[in-house]
Amino acid sequence: SLSIGGRPAYYYGQIRVDPNDPDVVYVLSIRTMKTEDGGQTWDQAAFNFGGDDHALWIDPQDSDHMILGYDHGMGVTWDGGENWYHPDNQSLAQFYAVGFDMSRPYRVAGGLQDNGSHMAYHTNPAGGPIRFEQWNRVGGGDGMYNEFDYCNNRYLYNESQFGPIRRLDLWTGESRSIRYRDPELRFNWNAPILVSPHDCDVIYHGSNKLLRSPYRGESWEVVSPDLTKADPATLTTGKGGDGNIQYATITTVDESPLVEGLLWVGTDDGNVQVTENGGDDWTLLNDNIPNNPEYWVSRVEASNHDSATAYLSYTGYRRDDFRPFVYKTTDLGQTWTDISSNLPQGPVNVIREHHENPDLLFVGNEFGVFVSINGGESWTSMKNDMPTQPVHDMKIHPRENDLIAATHGRGIYIADISALVEVTPDLLAQDAHFFRPESKVRWIQADFTEYASDNFDGESEPQAIPFYYYLGQDLGEDVTFTVYQGEIPISTLTGSGEAGLHKVMWGMDKRQERSQRQQEQLRERYAQWGRDVDEDQIRYSSEPAPIGDYTVVMTAGGEEMTRAVSILRDEWWMERK
């Protein structure tokens, strides 16, 4: 046999046969290999393009027309690979992990396959979409974890493959290595980084042992023994397994937000361990987990509500096992309950618990995001405008109630989950419910970005406040919302009266009555243009509602429900300059 796929072969060694000539075959690898004689001889394909080539489509009508998918996106050729067009108007980012800070708007940063780490605001305060040019490169190599200092939004900790961790000062632009150098340690391709929820100067970093820095990576201490199985059959000198991929490493670490030093760790060879005293003593929990596959531990999530509660997920796709594995413990790992329930067949990459509602859980798997409102008894797909794709990481922004999903192939998606926080089985039995609206900042629009029109634009959040509501049954009429500034009604909105969960958007505006002279001038102007116009458009104008507090009344089926909401002043725009 002849090895032609390169070494290491990696996971994308696809074979593609030219539909117009069976003797022409391509093998995808770090570089694409090609044969023109049915495999007798092989050479590197004459593609002056690509690198880590994952996918190849060959036009059945024209073999010179091909589309190549690789680590930096995609390329299109019409001349057999001599020249390539690289379209940048598609969202094709392969994220491994995502983090956020507490600035306004908050920043999102994530690591990309062979494309470094990048950071941008979650919305464009200048108005319009999030431009390609508004992303900043904040790390190199294969980008992995990105975790912010949540106290002052100054420091970003990130890494490239196999653990080279750096600290970026977002105020000064200084970037420096803070890697703990010990050649005997093994780091995963995507080695976990954790900023302690109790002290933002304290950082944890996973190798085969857990590392702790008491002060921003200036120094490190080892706070565990080897937490993996360390099977000699999987280990080589400084590496694990075949090729250049290290094995027997920590893949996930979390600290209880309720108890300092209560740490959970999972490894790629199936170990799950916990310490209650910052690493002095560790307990191996494998035997307590029912039907434990001892596969790659994709996530351990410490509960925000109970220090003895945690969640656990495994991924078995490397073992050709595509069952979902999700567990929950309420007694520090002594017993575990399977909560995979009706999740589809497919590996689970991440699980998150909401910080306000302990029964509100989210899972990211190979198909997208799934939500449970009953603590994992049942799961529902969150599709909406999100295509089917693997979700490798998720975070929940505690102030904004946004779910941030990092996909491995279609970029980052953000969903407003504020309404879901209140959803319970009891609420769904009600006739109607008006969810608590979240206040919104009216951004100062300044510093517009120059951009290329052919680049991809991300979506900003609407410059509006959503009003979410639920109806247990059809009303046969619209639902109305009236916004009051004090005692004065300033805006009226209508929404669907059908059963289900709905949303209407208030554009943070107020209806202002024009003077008689202004109304007459408008009538004359529309008459000159020969246009018919509604009398309300003549009588009222729409103006931005001022910064301040408002009352919203929802009327549904003759019943009224009242909520408060605020428009916040943009006090942070100078920080963004």
Roles of regions detected by a PLM:
Residues 559-576:
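Short beta-strand elements
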Residues 92, 388, 498-499, 546-547:
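Surface-exposed loops/turns
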Residues 174-177, 378-380, 487-493, 561:
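Surface-exposed loop/edge segments in extracytoplasmic proteins
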Residues 293, 489-543:
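Glycine-centered tight-turn motifs at strand-turn-strand junctions
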Residues 305, 460, 474, 497-499, ...:
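Surface-exposed coil/turn segments at beta-strand junctions on protein surfaces, enriched
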